[in-house]
Regions:
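Conserved short histidine dyad/triad with adjacent acidic residue
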Residues: 13-16, 28-30, 45-60
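Short, conserved beta-strand element in jelly-roll/cupin
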Residues: 44-50, 59-79, 117-119
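A hydrophobic, small-residue-rich beta->alpha segment in the mid-to-C-terminal subdomain
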Residues: 124-139
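Short histidine-centered beta-strand/loop micro-motifs
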Residues: 33-36, 54-60, 77, 85-86, ...
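A short, N-terminal "cap"/entry segment at the start of jelly-roll beta-barrel domains
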Residues: 1-42, 135-139, 145-179
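Short acidic-glycine-tyrosine-enriched beta hairpin
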Residues: 13-14, 38-39, 65-67, 79-98
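Ligand-binding loop in jelly-roll beta-barrel domains
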Residues: 90, 98-124
Length: 179
């Protein structure tokens, strides 16, 4: 692997199994393709949405762009008649403007893998909110959820309420000892 920092060129051979720390974001995982440096202007990640996993409705001041590399998932987007689910398949590109409510869910039997391009600020949020992946996936504890929610609030993210999520077909998970 060749890698430099600053304004120099970077080559990171993620596809060849170069060790990159994966972070668990309460189910989905991300791996940084670019350095997770808040001083940069953008961030590139490899995101994995496991089968059966849903990222509930949320919004933030950072645009996100997704190129679906493998698999398929549904993305909740603002359409002409309100929020609607769109299927995103391998090769599809999805743009989510800043401040737009959105969600993701994988109803397929296979993981959905995306190349995600967003702001360095959102990358910094992922760095702070994520738990290092060290083994098989573990369900989040109530403390993990509370920590994630507090960080989202600190970063100015808006998390959909259970009623807002239910209105678009998302059932919010119940965690032992809390909501």
């Amino acid at each position: 692997m060749q890698s430099t920092t600053g304004n120099a060129n970077i080559v990171r051979r993620v596809a060849e199994g170069t060790p990159v720390q994966a972070l668990d974001l309460l189910g989905p995982t991300v791996e940084f393709v670019t350095e997770p440096d808040a001083r940069g202007s953008f961030c590139v990640l490899r995101g994995v949405l496991p089968p059966g996993m849903t990222v509930p409705m949320h919004s933030h001041d950072d645009a996100e762009d997704f190129l679906v590399l493998t698999g398929t998932h549904q993305v909740l987007l603002q359409g002409p008649d309100g929020l609607e689910w769109a299927h995103a398949h391998a090769g599809d590109y999805v743009h989510i403007p800043a401040g737009t409510p959105h969600a993701h869910r994988n109803t397929s039997p296979d993981p959905a893998v995306d190349l995600v391009i967003t702001s360095a600020r959102l990358g910094q949020f992922f760095t702070e909110a994520g738990r290092p992946v060290t083994g098989p996936p573990q369900p989040p504890s109530p403390a993990d959820v509370a920590r994630f929610t507090a960080l989202a609030d600190r970063y100015g993210h808006t998390l959909g309420t259970p009623d807002e999520n239910a209105a678009v077909g998302i059932e919010m998970p119940k965690f032992a000892g809390g909501q």
